[in-house]
């Protein structure tokens, strides 16, 4: 899980999702998981 100021999709499987006001990137590649912090 990466924590970043700006989350971006890294590949075509990445999706930007808002959960409880937190912006996240979910992907089939676990290295692409991100969270805005």
UniProtKB/Swiss-Prot annotation:
Stored NCBIfam families: rpmJ_bact
Alphabetic keyword roster: Ribonucleoprotein, Ribosomal protein
Family: Belongs to the bacterial ribosomal protein bL36 family.
Entries under InterPro entries matching the protein: Ribosomal_bL36, Ribosomal_bL36_sp
Organism the protein comes from: Methylobacillus flagellatus (strain ATCC 51484 / DSM 6875 / VKM B-1610 / KT)
Coiled-coil annotated spans: none
Keyword DNA damage: no
Protein known as: Large ribosomal subunit protein bL36A
GO CC terms of this entry: cytoplasm; ribonucleoprotein complex; ribosome
Keyword Ribosomal protein part of the UniProt annotation: yes
GO BP term (any one): translation
Pfam families in the record: Ribosomal_L36
GO MF: structural constituent of ribosome
């Amino acid at each position: 899980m990466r924590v970043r100021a700006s989350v971006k999709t890294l590949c075509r499987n990445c999706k930007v999702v808002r959960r409880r006001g937190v912006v996240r990137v979910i992907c089939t590649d676990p290295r692409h998981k991100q969270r805005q912090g």
